[in-house]
Curated annotation (Swiss-Prot):
Domain of life per record: Eukaryota
One of the GO biological process terms: transcription initiation at RNA polymerase II promoter
GO cellular component: cytosol; transcription factor TFIIH core complex; transcription factor TFIIH holo complex
Record key words, sorted: DNA damage, DNA repair, Nucleus, Transcription, Transcription regulation
GN (gene name): TFB5
Protein name: General transcription and DNA repair factor IIH subunit TFB5
Subcellular localization(s) per the UniProt record: Nucleus
Length: 69
């Protein structure tokens, strides 16, 4: 029996793909299919969650010289 799922095609570089896979490992069910090294098919209702998690992860790696510690 076939099951259809709505998905969104994501094109990204391999480093961002690795981050999305990391996000999927912590909250599974986001990635429907890994197509190749630069394309993923993710659930359509998880797009905003993936964007916010990517922004959170990437903001950790930005150096701001004006930010007080």
């Amino acid at each position: 029996m076939l099951v259809a799922s709505k998905g969104v095609l994501v094109q990204c570089d391999p480093s961002i793909k690795a981050l999305i896979i990391q996000i999927d490992s912590s909250s599974s069910g986001i990635i429907l299919e890994e197509l190749d090294e630069t394309h993923l098919l993710i659930q359509h209702d998880k797009v905003n969650f993936v964007k916010s998690e990517l922004n959170r992860l990437l903001s950790k790696n930005i150096y701001n010289p004006f930010e007080e510690e």
